Each structure stands twice: as structure tokens, then as C-alpha cells.
Amino acid sequence: MYSRIIGTGSYLPEKVLTNQDLESMVDTSDEWIRTRTGIERRHIAAEGQMASDLALEASRNAIEAADIQAKDIDLIIVATTTPDMIFPSTACILQNKLGMSNGPAFDVQAVCSGFIYALATADMFVSSGKARNALVVGAEVYSRIMDWNDRSTCVLFGDGAGAVILTRDQKPGILSSHLHADGSYSQVLTAPASIHSGKIQGTPFITMEGGTVFKFAVKVLEEAALEALQANQLQPSDIDWLIPHQANIRIITSTAKKLGIPEEKVVATVSQHGNTSAASVPLALDQAVRDGRIQPDQHIVLEGVGGGFTWGSVLVRW
């Protein structure tokens, strides 16, 4: 028995922050941002709009696409680095907003690899018979943990959510998943704040060593894709679509080049929403499904890399 994706959905907040807007906020330019990242705009959550609110809209779209009802879902996994609160989980909050009270609901935190981790986890539940219909969501409000005076990071990130519905099926859907982590890199990309006696200790904002992140990301994204292909006796030429984490265009194109995958087989949406962390892969997937690029029986590699470092891949037959 397999798990199969039967519906996708996404949501981006209404407010758009362009590169031109950022020119008036920090010492940067539209040309500098586009040349180095490929990003043209990013979406920013409204005041009071939480990760669960973004997740709710993406989930509704995925549920509609799957032609099921919320009550049919018996597992919710939300990947987020920016939860609504310390606890309860954003997944539990989302479950309530969907009008549900059945089945487990929990969060996964693997930063930009979060959706890959969550999808792999849901696949294990569904393919083993522990769940029938799973809702898997990546949702982020990175604007809340951004230092808007730091031009090295504030130009990169945006808010958004993407979701998929997994169901049990005899026909192959998710073929394999591959997850990894190396905590020795934990200080390279981090938001290191912690709470002690009600007070925040350390900076709550994102800090990163950009050069180290770039080199590591390209290396492990190539390895993760090859691992998935080798596990299924496939070659890079057998990939119909590569959907990597939408960090920046240089990482995306460098990964594809190392794999020998032509640009026309790569789904890249980073220009329209920036790095949305755990939301980026399902956002890109949903766009490619809705615009008709993804067709039945195609092979798709979904992959991500994030702080930790964490990384992984999922190979899908659509």
C-alpha cells in the first residue's frame, strides 16, 4: 500500500513587499537583490495574522482540490519554524479552525526542510494503515523573526503556506523518502533566542553565514536527489520535475546543473515569494499542479535543506 497526493493548496498574504520597497528601508537595490537571489517580491502577513491562519487558507484549497471534506482527515502535520505560540501546536490550532477533533495533530520543526520531514512522516502513517487521509502543511511567518535593519537577511524571506492531502492507495504515489541532519552546523543558520523566566535571552532574529549555507545546500540537495533516484533505480534523466526548496535562484540553478537537469524541468517560484522556509516546496508544487505542468505518472523530486542542518528528499510518481 502507498500514499498518494490527491490535492494541493497554497496561500500568500495580501501585503506585498517589493525590492523597491526595501530600497527605502535598508542599503540595498532591486538589481542587487535580483542578481544575487532571483527574488523580486515577498508577501508579509497582516498584523495579527498567524501561521495557523495562513495554514488554514492553504488547507482549505488543498481539501477542495482533493474533493474531500475536513471531517475525512484523520492526521494533521504542520511544518513550521514560526508557530502561533509555544504550545499548543499550530497543528492543533489548525485542527480546531477546520472544525475537526478527530485524529492526531502535531508540528514538525526542521526549518526549511520541514515540509519534506512532515511529508515523509505522513507517508509512514498513511502507507502503514495508521491514517487514511493526511493533511500536511508548511506555514511560516518569517517576517516576525526578521531584523528589518539587516540587509543580508531581510531581503530573503517571506510569509506563506502550502498544503497537500495524502490518501492511501494501491497505486504508487510516494516512492521513497530520505531524511538527514547534522547538528554540528546548528550555529550557521539560526534564530538563537530562548525564554528564561518570562524573558527573551539572545537575539530572536535570523542570523546566517551565507557562504557556508550556499555551499552546504548545493552539496546536500544534489546528494538527496541522487539518493532518491538510486533507491528507485532511476537516473537524473528520468526526473520530470525537480522541486527544491526555494531559497534563492543561485542554489536552485546550481543544484540542477550538478544533477544535469535542464532548467525547463525545474520548478522555481522564489522570484514571487522569496524564501518561505517550510512553505516553499508545497507552494511551488501547488503552482506547478495548478498551471498544468505536472501530469499523471510523472516523476517528481521534492527536496529541502534548512537550519540544523537538516535536509531530505521525497520521490513522487504523480
UniProtKB/Swiss-Prot annotation:
Keywords noted in UniProt: Acyltransferase, Cytoplasm, Fatty acid biosynthesis, Fatty acid metabolism, Lipid biosynthesis, Lipid metabolism, Multifunctional enzyme, Transferase
List residues traversing the bilayer: none
Q: What is this protein called?
A: Beta-ketoacyl-[acyl-carrier-protein] synthase III
Residue ranges of region ACP-binding?
Answer: 246-250
Pathway in which the depicted protein is active: Lipid metabolism; fatty acid biosynthesis
Q: Is Iron given among the entry's keywords?
A: no
Q: What is its main location?
A: cytoplasm
What does the subunit comment say?
Homodimer.
Q: List GO BP terms, alphabetically.
A: fatty acid biosynthetic process
Q: Which GO molecular function annotation, any one, does this entry have?
A: beta-ketoacyl-acyl-carrier-protein synthase III activity
Q: Indicate where this protein resides in the cell.
A: Cytoplasm
Record's family?
Answer: Belongs to the thiolase-like superfamily. FabH family.
Q: Which domain of life is it from?
A: Bacteria
What CDD domains would the database entry show?
KAS_III
The terms describing its cellular component in GO are:
cytoplasm
Q: What does this protein do?
A: Catalyzes the condensation reaction of fatty acid synthesis by the addition to an acyl acceptor of two carbons from malonyl-ACP. Catalyzes the first condensation reaction which initiates fatty acid synthesis and may therefore play a role in governing the total rate of fatty acid production. Possesses both acetoacetyl-ACP synthase and acetyl transacylase activities. Its substrate specificity determines the biosynthesis of branched-chain and/or straight-chain of fatty acids.
Q: Which Pfam families match?
A: ACP_syn_III (PF08545), ACP_syn_III_C (PF08541)
Recorded hits in InterPro entries, A to Z, give:
ACP_syn_III_C, ACP_syn_III_N, FabH, Thiolase-like
Task: Give the gene name.
Answer: fabH
EC class name: transferase
Q: What is its EC number?
A: 2.3.1.180
Active-site feature positions: 112, 245, 275
Q: What is known of its domains?
A: The last Arg residue of the ACP-binding site is essential for the weak association between ACP/AcpP and FabH.
Organism of derivation:
Nitrosomonas europaea (strain ATCC 19718 / CIP 103999 / KCTC 2705 / NBRC 14298)
Per the record, what are the reactions this protein catalyses?
Answer: malonyl-[ACP] + acetyl-CoA + H(+) = 3-oxobutanoyl-[ACP] + CO2 + CoA
